[in-house]
From Swiss-Prot:
Name listed for the protein in its UniProt record: GATA type zinc finger protein asd-4
Organism: Neurospora crassa (strain ATCC 24698 / 74-OR23-1A / CBS 708.71 / DSM 1257 / FGSC 987)
MF terms (GO), sorted A to Z: DNA-binding transcription factor activity, RNA polymerase II-specific; RNA polymerase II cis-regulatory region sequence-specific DNA binding; zinc ion binding
Keyword rRNA processing tagged: no
SUPFAM superfamilies in UniProt: Glucocorticoid receptor-like (DNA-binding domain) (SSF57716)
Region (Disordered): 70-143, 159-178, 306-426
Biased composition (Low complexity): 104-113, 306-318, 354-419
Lineage: Eukaryota, Fungi, Dikarya, Ascomycota, Pezizomycotina
Annotated zinc fingers (GATA-type), start-end: 16-40
Subunit details: Homotetramer.
GO CC terms: nucleus
Gene this protein is translated from: asd-4
Protein keywords: Coiled coil, DNA-binding, Metal-binding, Nucleus, Transcription, Transcription regulation, Zinc, Zinc-finger
Length: 426
């Protein structure tokens, strides 16, 4: 039976579509899915064009490669490859509806795997350097195969081995793989490890719980202290604003007080200035008045000097009393003598008319009375003398200011003898 299967395998062996060879260590496919030998596939992959027929050879050269892989790594890699093959077989079985092919204990699957491990009597090792590329092999499970024929072949071979098939309702044996029961010691060890893990998790949970409680406490304290701090800050700001307001109020009052003081001082200065102006005006007016009095005094001595001479001739006894007064007047009056000479040189007279009026007013009463009795001739002499000193009156006024009090003081006695003269005559 096995020989017939191998014969069927040989008849279905593929050939290269480019060079028509059937002896190659590895089969490849092009972009269109056509089967190529290893040489044609590599040439097409490297050069991008089909391999020419002139390069075809029937001798396959093999290079000797020494495997330096460690035994333990080789075993692990082999186990991984077997597991991968089993997964691929399971996937193909699911696609084709083959349930019995998924079981690794199925002898038909094992026989199929064993038949796939040889090509033309040469074992195919997946660890060989030829299979390093990702190009699929003809017998690689990645290449789609007509599973209907294979399933028929396997169905024919299974009864010959006498292996009973697994019933669909049979449960898997607990002795297979991971379903084996654990011993008491293993259970105790697993329980102890779980308890240790639980205790560790509890400790970690307590730590997290304590940290969380601490954070909550700090947050509560911070939230409780924030209003107090804010209130304290607001109070401090209010106090500072109140102090600033009081200070500004004091400064305002002080400025008002200074303003009032300055106003009072200004009023006082204005009053003083007004008084000074009034005093100056009064002094100026007094100077004019004194000058007029001086002019009157200057005009009167001539009349007085003339008047006592007549009573002396008539009545010598009463005329001796007013003699000292004219002497005092005569001492002050000699100054106007040089004035007429300097007057034309310095400046013209300002206004002689008011002086003449004032000088003429006191003259008629005292001078006219004695002249009627004795001599009318001297009266025109007094009138003629009056206009002479008037031009120099304004200029001589400053020189005569110290003598003004004497004239004012001497004015009463001057009038007295003039009045007594008519009494004596009467």
């Amino acid at each position: 039976m096995a020989t017939m299967a191998n014969h069927d395998r040989e008849t279905t062996q593929p050939t290269c579509q480019n060079c028509a060879t059937s002896t190659t260590p590895l089969w490849r496919r092009d972009e269109m899915g056509q089967v190529l030998c290893n040489a044609c596939g590599l040439f097409l992959k490297l050069h991008g064009r089909p391999r020419p027929i002139s390069l075809k050879t029937d001798v396959i050269k093999s290079r000797n490669r020494v495997k330096t892989m460690r035994p333990d790594l080789a075993k692990q890699k082999k186990q991984q490859q077997q597991q991968q093959q089993q997964q691929n077989l399971a996937a193909t079985a699911d696609m084709n509806g083959g349930v019995g092919m998924m079981d690794p204990n199925n002898p038909a699957a094992a026989a199929r795997r064993a038949s796939q491990k040889s090509i033309n009597g040469h074992p195919v090792d997946d660890n060989s350097p030829v299979s390093r590329t990702g190009t699929p092999n003809v017998y690689n499970p990645h290449i789609p195969i007509d599973h209907s024929l294979e399933y028929q072949f396997q169905a024919q071979q299974i009864p010959g081995f006498g292996v009973p098939t697994a019933s669909p309702g049979r449960a898997p044996s607990p002795m297979n793989g991971e379903h084996m029961p654990q011993t008491h010691e293993q259970l105790l060890a697993a329980n102890a490890s779980l308890k240790t893990r639980v205790s560790e998790l509890e400790v970690i949970q307590e730590l997290y719980r304590g940290r969380l409680h601490q954070l909550e406490t700090e947050e509560n304290i911070r939230q409780a202290s924030e209003p107090g701090k804010l209130e304290a800050q607001l109070r401090a700001q209010i106090d500072a604003m109140g102090e600033a307001h009081q200070q500004l109020q004091k400064e305002l009052e002080e400025s008002h007080r200074r303003e009032n003081m300055l106003k009072r001082r200004l009023d006082e200065l204005e009053v003083e200035l007004k008084d000074v102006k009034d005093a100056l005006e009064s002094q100026d007016n007094g100077r004019h008045k004194k000058i007029r009095l001086d002019e009157n005094v200057k005009t009167e001595p001539y009349a007085e000097v003339v008047e006592p001479q007549q009573p002396e001739q008539q009545q010598p006894a009463p005329a001796e009393q007013p003699i000292p007064t004219p002497m005092a007047i005569d001492e002050a009056t000699p100054a106007p003598a040089p004035a007429p000479e300097a007057a034309p040189e310095q400046a013209p007279a300002p206004a002689p008319e008011p002086v003449q009026e004032q000088a003429q007013e006191p003259e008629p009463a005292p001078v006219s009375e004695p002249t009627e009795a004795s001599a009318p001739a001297p009266a025109p002499e007094a009138d003629s003398v009056v206009p002479e000193p008037t031009p120099a009156a304004p200029e001589s006024a400053p020189t005569e200011e110290p003598a003004a009090p004497e004239t004012e003081a001497s004015e009463p006695p001057t009038t007295a003898p003039v009045e007594e003269a008519p009494k004596a005559e009467s």
